[in-house]
Amino acid sequence: MAAESGKIDPMHQFEVTPLGGGFNLGGQEVLFTNSALWMVVAAITLGLFMWGGMRRQLVPGRWQVAVEGFTGFISSMMMANIGTEGRKYTPYVFSLFMFILFCNLLGMLPLGVLGLHPFTVTSHIAITGVLALISFAIVLVVGFWRHGLHFFSLFVPHGTPLPMIPIIAPIEFVSFMVRPFSLGLRLFVAMTAGHVLLKVLSGFVINGFNAETLWLGSIVSVLSFTLMIGISALELLVAGIQAYVFALLTSLYINDAVNLH
């Protein structure tokens, strides 16, 4: 938490800071940062979660039920959006969904009381943008692999009158090209906004108790803390919803490449 003259900077939590020595790669210094650390933590946590749930038991435990619930949820979504062809892409979309979900949830851990500062990886457009570009690249590869140049027919909706094609095709093309930007931006904005609001409210709590008029400051602090509890619960919901929306839109984009709707 950054504090200057008693003020709390709500944007300090998003700063990427180096944690140790790096190495030189092609003239550029590569550093291990707090962002990289929490991506590693998310990957390890996710791996342990999946490993624990994949141990088959005659009577499934809660851990196994949770893992099977997630896999069944994504598998059903892929089948509903793409059909039987969706099974090929389920591992990718499932990995994407779980990674985003774990990154979102890890960023919500109240570790500040222990002197640790969790970093929300998905609060950076560089990370969400790369995830979106990977999904977009898969859509392009699948589209051209399956349909060749006929993939360009995606930009001319079925039944479009011939005179309207010069107008509709560019609009559809631009709409298609902005998909990775909107996909990455949506997740970035949603996660950043909630964390900024929580940090601002935490500043109200601290400064309220340090106010000269203690009774008034205490009221502000209590109200702010109550709001923090409610918004934290909402942020947990947003963490799951945003992971789902990212996975859902990815599956819909893949469906366009597979079925050329």
Swiss-Prot record:
Transmembrane annotation, as ranges: 30-50, 63-83, 96-116, 125-145, 151-171, 187-207, 214-234, 235-255
Name of the protein this chain belongs to: ATP synthase subunit a
PANTHER family per the UniProt record, alphabetical: ATP SYNTHASE SUBUNIT A (PTHR11410:SF0)
Membrane topology: Multi-pass membrane protein
The organism's place on the tree of life at top rank: Bacteria
Single GO cellular component term: plasma membrane
Known partners and oligomeric status: F-type ATPases have 2 components, CF(1) - the catalytic core - and CF(0) - the membrane proton channel. CF(1) has five subunits: alpha(3), beta(3), gamma(1), delta(1), epsilon(1). CF(0) has three main subunits: a(1), b(2) and c(9-12). The alpha and beta chains form an alternating ring which encloses part of the gamma chain. CF(1) is attached to CF(0) by a central stalk formed by the gamma and epsilon chains, while a peripheral stalk is formed by the delta and b chains.
Gene this chain is encoded by: atpB
Pfam families per UniProt: ATP-synt_A (PF00119)
